């Protein structure tokens, strides 16, 4: 049986509606003396202002949402550095070493910065009780649940209700011979008696970590007074929407917020965000397919499969898994009241008239999580009621679209600070928000938090012939290649260029430019052998690669007429798996001469030469590495876009960059999207073997940077990956006669964080590190801005040291991490993360997107994936 979203039936709830304990947006009763206004609460729901569908259903899986149940999971919300969405902190993962009195460094120029945080000056001093609320017969609509419960506000007192859980300042005594503390009765509009049964779950003290769950609920209740609309997880302001009519989309500005305990104070983190809301519906996409394609069904299906859509009538999002062309809005499904057609259902429930009665239905299948929670029915959705969200690949590839969006989304620091202060002012001036915060004795500071910070000493970039460039605030040394040679060159004597015959002249001109450019950098590139192909079919490219690889070239350059994902995938599969050889793929559009910008082609040639040198184990530049015998490791994960059950974990390690420019890399496939790699210890053993073969010894120290950690996985990383890795390393080192074991530091690197900080009204310069105030007391962590941006606000990167016995202090770890952001050879400047992290990302992305299998081991010592 296939159902529409939120049908009136006990099973088959809307996708993603497995109740959880932190759905802060699900309607709140007046709290602690707040003036009651039931019409306002219901009115918001009717308008969709309180998101998540004021009609989501509740079922037997609800017990899992209690605080006591959550505590069983060692979850930290989002290990990327913030509490994402409605997930709140329960058990914390402590990474700060016992006895560590200070994790702050002292090296560098001391400055003061502002951050996008506000102090919580006052907070409640209470014990609050949590209850679970059940309705008999079951009431699916959350807005009705709120309304029915609100009728008993006199008995309940001040409370917060999210549709499932009620937080209340009153403790109700247990009823004898009953699991419930309160059993209330109310009447529906039809005159039916509705029993409301309230069961005690637990309590939260003002000193408990769970208090932040309640504080975030209260904050979201206060934000409701700002006339914001909840879409998915965050609140957005439709009144301030920005219409991009030429691109059929709107940008809704919004806020991502989180209250939690930081180093010394409880702070509210507030970040400005934007939601892309397309003005077209799935029906518009269907109409375009019918108009433009002979096989409209296949075209429409390709366009919408995997798309996330928004249904305005219940403000919920769904992922499209299939299209049922055999079903129409006239089809019927079963409810508790009997069968009903989709047309009649939407008319009766939402007063919506379906106009096209022949349109197909799109399907959203339940996830494994939904099924475990009892949501085992597919959801059927009417195309004309489903609005497309997000951006298509075509939009992302359209420079005009991106430029139009960036004018509004890439806020400079001064505009971002102004918006943050305006948000704070609205919270402190809106009557409903003020009453909500005041009733719970919560007060926010008006000023952004000020933080002590430091600017680390600038790095020295080492080139050939002992030339040195001291990196400045631009964090870019591209121009230095005009006068400097690369640190270590690999001369190219045997190489092939595969090009379509009709484009031979343009290809030869570009190759000659590369040869001249290399010569100016003291790198010798001989003339290549040209392998002309009569056409650009995949099979033709494959045959040409086979012909070239048979002659053992150092590298193969392949020219494509235009970007083509399928063709690129074919080339990379051939050169990375079937006939392993380093390859450099270029497109004619990039390498063809341009009259308008002749110097631009020289810049492209320079970048290509640098890439080719790096792929052949050369070193375009170097930084000063103070430690001998240091192996740095990067690990990242990329999910396969073609198979959601597959992901690829890439492992990249250096072989002591002070003495060697070889790398070790490998990729493992993982099933069911799991971002934890059981193969990590095996990969590490292989990397150590490669290191031993080159140096006749094991590394003195290992610095491991772990990227790709998803929500709530920090506990698993600490207790499975790190512990397994340490055990394996100790075993290897002790078997080699090193009884003290391995000295390793393991750092979680997180880019997707909401923290921002500013120097005055400007971006902080590269090397600005923050290790106080907004860091977390349970962590050994710091924030680092390593890159420079020209437009918008720079994003810091979070470093969480979860294991450390290298014997280096905070200063040295921070400076080492900063050094490693200078070593990415695909860009002559600093990047957001240590280079090995980005190398791992590039490799995982290449395999997930193009190769779909493990590359040949014959390439594992080269940066062939650049």
Curated annotation (Swiss-Prot):
Keyword Iron: no
Residues annotated as domain Piwi: 555-852
GO CC terms in record: cytoplasm; cytosol; nucleus; P granule; perinuclear region of cytoplasm
GO molecular function, a single term: piRNA binding
BP-aspect Gene Ontology terms: defense response to Gram-negative bacterium; dorsal appendage formation; global gene silencing by mRNA cleavage; heterochromatin formation; maintenance of pole plasm mRNA location; maternal mRNA clearance; mitotic chromosome condensation; oocyte karyosome formation
SUPFAM superfamilies: PAZ domain, Ribonuclease H-like
Keyword Cytoplasm: yes
PTM per Swiss-Prot/TrEMBL: Symmetrical dimethylation of arginines (sDMA) on Arg-11, Arg-13 and/or Arg-15 by csul/PRMT5/DART5, is required for binding to tud, localization to the pole plasm and association with the correct piRNAs. SDMA on Arg-11, Arg-13, Arg-15 and/or Arg-17 is required for binding to krimp and stable recruitment to subregions of the nuage. Methylation state does not affect protein stability. SDMA plays an important role in ping-pong amplification of piRNAs and is essential for function in vivo. Methylation state functions as an indicator of its piRNA binding state.
Residue stretches making up the PAZ domain: 281-390
Keywords: Acetylation, Cytoplasm, Developmental protein, Differentiation, Hydrolase, Methylation, Oogenesis, RNA-binding, RNA-mediated gene silencing, Spermatogenesis, Translation regulation
Name of this protein: Protein aubergine
Species this chain originates from: Drosophila melanogaster
Gene (UniProt): aub
């Amino acid at each position: 049986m296939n159902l529409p979203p939120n049908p009136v039936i006990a099973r088959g709830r809307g996708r993603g509606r497995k109740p959880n304990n932190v759905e802060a947006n699900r309607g709140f009763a007046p709290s602690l003396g707040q003036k009651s206004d039931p019409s306002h609460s219901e009115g918001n729901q009717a308008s969709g202002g309180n998101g998540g569908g004021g009609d989501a259903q509740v079922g037997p899986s609800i017990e899992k949402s209690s605080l006591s149940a959550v505590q069983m999971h060692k979850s930290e919300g989002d290990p990327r550095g913030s509490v994402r969405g409605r997930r709140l902190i329960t058990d914390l993962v402590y990474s700060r070493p016992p006895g560590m009195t200070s994790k702050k460094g002292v090296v560098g120029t001391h400055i003061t910065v502002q951050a996008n945080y506000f102090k919580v000056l006052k907070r409640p001093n209470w014990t609050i009780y949590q209850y679970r609320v059940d309705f008999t017969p079951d009431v699916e609509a959350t807005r009705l649940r709120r309304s029915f419960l609100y009728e008993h506000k006199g008995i309940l007192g001040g409370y917060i209700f999210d549709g499932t859980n009620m937080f209340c300042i009153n403790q109700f005594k247990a009823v004898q011979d009953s699991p419930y503390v309160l059993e209330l009765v109310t009447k529906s509009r039809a005159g039916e008696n509705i029993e409301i049964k309230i069961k005690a779950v637990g309590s939260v003290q003002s000193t408990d970590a769970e208090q932040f769950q309640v504080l975030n609920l209260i904050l979201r209740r206060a934000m409701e007074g700002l006339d914001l609309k909840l879409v998915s997880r965050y609140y957005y302001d439709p009144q301030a929407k920005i219409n991009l009519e030429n691109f059929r989309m709107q940008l809704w500005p919004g806020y991502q917020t989180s209250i939690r305990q930081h180093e010394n104070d409880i702070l509210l983190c507030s970040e400005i965000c934007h939601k892309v809301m397309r003005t077209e519906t799935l029906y518009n996409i269907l109409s375009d397919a019918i108009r433009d394609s002979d096989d409209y069904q296949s075209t429409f299906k390709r366009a919408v499969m995997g798309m996330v859509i928004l249904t305005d009538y219940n403000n919920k999002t769904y992922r499209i898994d299939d299209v049922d062309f055999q079903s129409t809005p006239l089809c019927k499904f079963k409810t508790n009241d009997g069968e009903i057609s989709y047309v009649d259902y939407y008319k009766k429930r939402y007063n919506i008239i379906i106009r096209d009665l022949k349109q197909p239905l799109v399907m959203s299948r339940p996830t494994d999580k939904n099924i475990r929670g009892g949501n085992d029915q597919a959801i059927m959705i009417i195309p004309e009621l489903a609005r497309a969200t997000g951006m298509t690949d075509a939009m992302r590839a359209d420079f005009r679209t991106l430029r139009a969006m960036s004018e509004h989304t890439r806020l400079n620091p001064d505009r971002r600070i102004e918006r943050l202060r305006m948000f704070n002012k609205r919270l402190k001036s809106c009557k409903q928000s003020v009453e909500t915060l005041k009733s719970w004795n919560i007060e926010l500071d008006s000023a952004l938090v000020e933080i002590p910070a430091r600017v680390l000493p600038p790095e020295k970039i080492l080139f050939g012939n002992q030339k040195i460039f001291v990196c400045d605030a631009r964090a870019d040394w591209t121009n230095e290649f005009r006068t400097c040679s690369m640190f270590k060159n690999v001369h190219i004597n045997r190489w092939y260029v595969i090009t379509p015959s009709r484009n031979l002249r343009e290809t030869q001109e570009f190759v000659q430019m590369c040869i001249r450019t290399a010569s100016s950098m003291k790198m010798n590139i001989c003339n290549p052998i040209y392998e002309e192909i009569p056409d650009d079919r995949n099979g033709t490219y494959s045959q040409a690669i086979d012909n070239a690889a048979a002659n053992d070239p150092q590298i193969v350059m392949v020219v494509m007429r235009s970007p083509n994902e399928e063709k690129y995938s074919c080339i990379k599969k051939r050169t990375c798996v079937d006939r392993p050889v380093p390859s450099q793929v270029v497109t004619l559009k990039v390498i063809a001469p341009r009259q308008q910008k002749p110097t631009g082609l020289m810049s492209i040639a320079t970048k290509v030469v640098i890439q080719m040198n790096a792929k052949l184990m050369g070193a375009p530049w170097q930084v000063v590495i103070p430690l001998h015998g240091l192996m740095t490791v990067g690990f990242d994960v990329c999910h396969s876009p073609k198979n959601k059950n597959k992901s690829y974990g890439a492992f990249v390690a250096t072989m002591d960059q002070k003495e060697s420019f070889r790398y070790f890399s490998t990729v493992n496939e993982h099933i069911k999207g799991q971002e934890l790699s059981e193969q990590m210890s095996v990969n590490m053993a292989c990397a150590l073997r490669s290191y031993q073969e080159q140096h006749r010894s094991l590394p003195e120290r290992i610095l491991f940077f772990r990227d790709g950690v998803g929500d709530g996985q920090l506990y698993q990383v600490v207790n499975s990956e790190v512990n397994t890795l340490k055990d394996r390393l100790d075993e290897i080192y002790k078997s080699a006669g090193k009884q003290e074991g391995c000295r390793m530091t393991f750092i979680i690197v997180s880019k997707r964080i909401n923290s921002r900080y500013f120097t005055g009204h400007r971006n902080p310069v590269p090397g600005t590190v923050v290790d106080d105030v907004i860091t977390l007391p349970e962590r050994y962590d710091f924030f680092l801005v390593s890159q420079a941006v020209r437009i918008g606000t720079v994003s810091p990167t979070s470093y969480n040291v979860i294991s450390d016995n290298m014997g280096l202090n905070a200063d040295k770890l921070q400076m080492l991490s900063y050094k490693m952001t200078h070593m990415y050879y695909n860009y002559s400047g600093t990047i957001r993360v240590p280079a090995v992290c980005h190398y791992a990302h590039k490799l995982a992305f290449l395999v997930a997107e193009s190769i779909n299998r493990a590359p040949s081991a014959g390439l594992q010592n080269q940066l062939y994936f650049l």
